[in-house]
């Protein structure tokens, strides 16, 4: 069973449709934006009680669980002009929300002695970019958290890994002005954005491989 957190748009929606097209059982969540044509479950990842309630409703179906954490937001502002509440909200969604989802499924994974957890980090976690301190902090923190959790659970056939995504054709990039996008692509050694199918292949690889654990895979076209 695959659980995709944040499946109403972007990477999460693409993965949801891709897995379903292959007749794989997958459930997804949304929070703020969905017409619910994909039969998603409304869950606020910052609310641990909502997460546990959602997992409880799915419990009869949950075996050989893969949890894919795609929910994420950003807030662009220079620190000296930033709104502390909006800055904190990025941490709450991207980091605390990911923790909440992992925390909710780990007991069941440990009981079943199987689990695959895949988190989406970002190239901005290591590549300095002005104006995205909240996003960079949230994605950097995923690295340390995932490594620690991998140590705790590796002996029970549970793997926890990150995909450090560069700039892809999905999600937030669609809001970027074309002129800026052209400049951005010019800075990527492969001279193109990441294609959705490459994200799927990387996710699938981490699902199938049981010896990669506590790792962060760079999927960035050579952008370092």
Description of each model-found segment:
Residues 107, 151-155:
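Alpha-helical segment proximal to the catalytic Tyr-Lys
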Residues 192-219:
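C-terminal substrate-recognition "lid" of short-chain dehydrogenase/reductases
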Residues 102, 138, 146:
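Active-site helix of classical SDR
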Residues 70-76, 222:
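Conserved NAD(P)H cofactor-binding loop of Rossmann-fold oxidoreductase domains
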Residues 78-79, 83-91, 173, 184:
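Substrate-binding pocket helix/loop in short-chain dehydrogenase/reductase
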Residues 8, 16:
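N-terminal Rossmann NAD(P)H-binding glycine-rich loop of SDR-like oxidoreductase domains
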Residues 122:
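Residue(s) in the substrate-gating loop at a strand-loop-helix junction
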